Amino acid sequence: MDIRKVKPCIKSSAFTRADWQTMRKYQAASERSGFILLPGKEVHARSPLFFLNANTLIIMQDIYIDIETYSSVDIKTSGAYKYIESPDFEILIISYAINDGPVITIDLAQGEPMADEFEEALFDPDFRKHAHNAVFERLSFRRIGYDIPVEQWYCTSVKAAYCGLPLSLDEVSKRLDLTNKKLDTGKALIKYFSCPCKPTKINGGRTRNYPWDAPEKWEMYKEYNVYDVLAEREIDQLLKQYVIPDFERQLYILDQHINDRGILVDMELANAAIEVDTIYTDVLMEKSRAINGLENPNSPVQLCKWLSRKTGDEITSLAKDQIPLLISKYSKDKDVVEVLETRQKLSRSSVKKYYAMINCAMRDNRVRGTFQFYGANRTGRWAGRLLQLQNLSKNHLENIELPRELIRAKDWQACEMMYDDVADILSQLVRTALIAPKGMTFCVADFSAIEAREVSWLANEEWRMDVFRGDGKIYEAAGARMFNVPISAVTKGSDLRAKAKNAELALGYQGSLGAMKRMGGDKMGMSDTEMMDIVRKWRKANPRIVELWQEVEDCAHEAVRYQRRVVGTPRNLIFDCNGEYFTVTLPSGRSLFYRNPRFVERVKNKQRVKLLCYDGIVQETKQWGDIDTYGGKLTENIVQAIARDLIGYSMLKLEEAGY
């Protein structure tokens, strides 16, 4: 039977919950194998056709969409939500393709009506809506009255990230070597038609370019839009065999709801903080200028020259870690000390996050779109956008409400009298500018030492798990084992605890001397010899973790070398390789993807060794390139990914509970 000719027996709106669960199961099976097993028969199933049972068939279809828009709001600084909220926002061009059909373009900017076929597909729940960075299309259509549930949207950007590829359509096009690559004419055309322009005599004083101002460019813009649809469809087809698990799908939907809700900002505090910072910066500059007479007392070049003249020594750096050393060295010279302390305060004075809040806050004073789903390749952790909420300054003050009210009242003098460093207070108050609506409580929750717990569980390091089952004081317990002393000797503030903490933070993923230094071991006064001794002691105290690194590396090498499935001893992780990808499947069912795995020869410790290598975004350069990996690094990816899955699972449970 050619099932492509079979019509659906029922519409999806009539499905029960059990029907949907059955369909999802068959959908996953069909996309993995191309076949569905039914009672007593085997039926070939090409997406988008899925059987619910032997007598019922639903045809799920795909529509691929890309749009070009206009708004006077800067999307880079204010985000997509505020960009789309702008009163002058409009959709200029829509291009779409249904299944394998031709790409159709609707020129809304020049008065073309919305196509009936497009509207029907958009509102039909049996159509999966695909777009690259689908949140933008979803919000744009909602803005013009086409409110399509997030559950019906599928993002090729997320799919690419899941498969170890970059997020941007342009970069994915290059890495997959698409037949229909994204055109490189887009940036100039977007700037011309989708952004405001400066009024000039040449353009007749207009503040915006319309299609009739440059008809040839407009045709190029429409062509550019068409190629985006072709590119995203090709991406979807090339990656179709790699199925995103249902758990990930649920998380994506939750992520979209969280970003849609946004977070409320205390605009009065944010505006007051910026005003106070402006005044306080001027006060500090005048204070420093009165001593050194410099035109710009905050200029490192000018200040270094003045300090060199004043001290008789050559001062070449005012880096953050150098200023305390200089203050200590020249402590008897009051002018030098005061100038350096003022410089410290000026360097701490940063109100960028307050500006970001104001730039991104919408009419209801909420900031939306602050989290990027699957922003980190492989681990799948969220990335911060706009406000960088994962990177906010901590507040250490016990009574945070007092300085908060002083800043809201713009009383910086009282704040300085009570706390001395107003810049530091402004930094600590950033978190408090994010507030709950009236009648609600803003709760912040996180796991405690989750990576240390994860690596202990993964390696089955029993003594560490006993610590976490008890008081959780891993630094004290590790110090006692490493230095062979009673745990009572490893107390908070002690040298032994500090060294154990440094080791715990640095060495869990096969780190050595370099890792100890990155975590500040040398700044604690430890020599290279002492740090290497701590490395040996930590590894001796954690033999199962050391074995875990080797087990993970061995499984990875076996999977890639022989291109076969390997079930690893660490908690039955599944290592697999099909030539195109090396994957590690986690307990959640999610896989970590490493593209184009291969072995390369490198010189390490003056010896030529073979290392596992893959293609990815190099962390240091943020560019696509070769990445070497090894047991400890793979362990880090696995641990962080499992930790992310646990957070994701908890988020789903909290959402279900009504938080």
What are the functions of these language-model segments?
Residues I59-I75, I93-S95, K181, A188-L426, ...:
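Conserved "right-hand" nucleotidyltransferase catalytic core of DNA-directed polymerases
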Residues S86-K240, E398, G472, A478-F483, ...:
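Active-site-proximal helix-loop-helix substrate-binding element of RNase H-like nuclease domains
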Residues Y64-I65, H132, Q152-C155, L434-I450:
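Conserved catalytic palm subdomain of right-hand nucleotidyl-transferase polymerases, strongest
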Residues V135-Y146, C163, K305-S308, S448-E462:
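Short active-site loop/helix that positions an aromatic residue
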Residues L239-L251, L646-Y659:
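Active-site palm subdomain of RNA-directed nucleic acid polymerases
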Residues A478-K492, K610-R644, G648-G658:
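Generic long, charged, amphipathic alpha-helical segments
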Residues N55-M60, E120-F123, I425-T441, L652-E656:
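A short acidic-Thr-Gly-centered motif at the start of a beta-strand
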